[in-house]
Amino acid sequence: MYTSCAASHGYVTSNGFSIPDDSQYNPSAKRSLVSVHMYSPYDFAMNPDMSKVNFNDAYRNELDQSFRVLHDKFVSQGIYVIVGEMGCINKNNLDQRINWAKYFVEQGRKQGCGSIVWDNGNWDNTKSAEETFGLYHRSQGTWEPDDLVNAYISASKASLG
């Protein structure tokens, strides 16, 4: 598995990032995997600015482009891509986060990229929404919000037809 500095999806798609040729070890199968972190689009997913709460068409287009580039550079060449960290912070916009989660996971799957949700256990957005990626209450063994977690799961199973 290969990743770039800070696992930036932008850098792995640049000309400065390359993957070693692993064909000498097994000429019939590529075994390389690229891992990226994708909190995209930044203004919606990670920027704590509470005015950027709606998952709109411009943000959808940005995600489409990011996944398309990952597909074209890696997946189309037989190199797997896993988004090893993804999520969007809590700006009291659960319905929009659900829309984002479904779209992110489904678009990633359409382009051949798997996704792993980031949960840092931080829930408190009363002072700032910064880094509020909490989903699982470790001390209680419960998920919150259930609707968001279910959106991730449903999107990972949905038919892509």
PLM ranges: what are they?
Residues 1-113:
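Extracellular glycoside hydrolase catalytic/binding regions
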Residues 93-161:
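Aromatic-rich peripheral "rim/lid" segments of glycoside hydrolase catalytic domains that contact
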